[in-house]
Amino acid sequence: MSETIKSDKTYVLDNYFDETTMSLHLKADRPILRKKWTPWNRNPVMDEKIITQDEMDALIQQIFDEATNEKWNYLEIDRKLSKVLQLGPYRIVIVYPPLSDATEITAVRPVKKTTIEDYNLSPEVMDLLTNHAKWILVSWAPGSGKSTFVQALVLVYHQNHHIIKTIESPRDLMVDEDVVQYSFTHWTHDEVRDILLLSRPDYTVYDEVRNTPDFELYKDLRLTWIGMLGVIHATKPVDSIQRFIGCIEMWIIPQVIDTVIFID
């Protein structure tokens, strides 16, 4: 049964979110914008309040203070003009001028935590996902619930006593503590490949497959018979497969993908 996401810890961003807020969009000297979640709609809501540059600077400092004070918070990307952090349930992107025309903060968090039963999958599909499919892609547009579905499927694999590892950037999947979460922040694709090939998990969750090195790593892991559960952006199911074309040899694709789950 699905449930509202709640954290045992408190964060400064809690002041900007309620139970229906999916994302927060802040730009210096502009009104605060939130996206709200309802079962059939995702509505942008603009506040009358304008957030100043000084308030943005203070908020950013609080975010960094919280990121360095907790074990499970991460600074995933640290560039001169952009930062990506995982702060509890919040995925935070901070961008500075001149990359952007003003200081910007975008914070996203999951609204609901689901179980696989919430998706009302047919017995045939459940049997496929749990007993047969080993080369799975989960696709659709950003914000469509791909990662939420993956979390529910990972829970099933964990309950079946499979060894699971994830590759994420940032590490924002909400999974059991038994699941090891890797990031490219401190590792190269080659290093992650070596670790996974040596540790031999039953399943590797790749959230998400974006660029050529990702496609190559996904292929290499799959061809060594590691179960793969990949997340990819695509507007149609066939696009999920077409995105692999040009990144890996076409004749290998049937050996890398056997199932596409399209979140519509």
Language-model features and meaning:
Residues 1-79:
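N-terminal accessory targeting/assembly segments
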Residues 16-19, 51-58, 76-82, 86-89, ...:
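Charged, alpha-helix-enriched surfaces in structured cytosolic catalytic cores
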Residues 24, 94, 221, 225:
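Residue-level signature of catalytic and energy-coupling elements of molecular machines
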Residues 26-28, 36-38, 87-89, 96-98, ...:
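Flexible glycine-/small-residue-rich
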Residues 46-47, 57-135:
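P-loop NTP-binding catalytic core
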Residues 111-112, 117-170:
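P-loop NTPase nucleotide-binding module
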Residues 163, 167-251:
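Switch/coupling sub-region of P-loop NTPases
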Residues 229, 257-262:
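Conserved beta-strand/loop subsegment of P-loop NTPase cores
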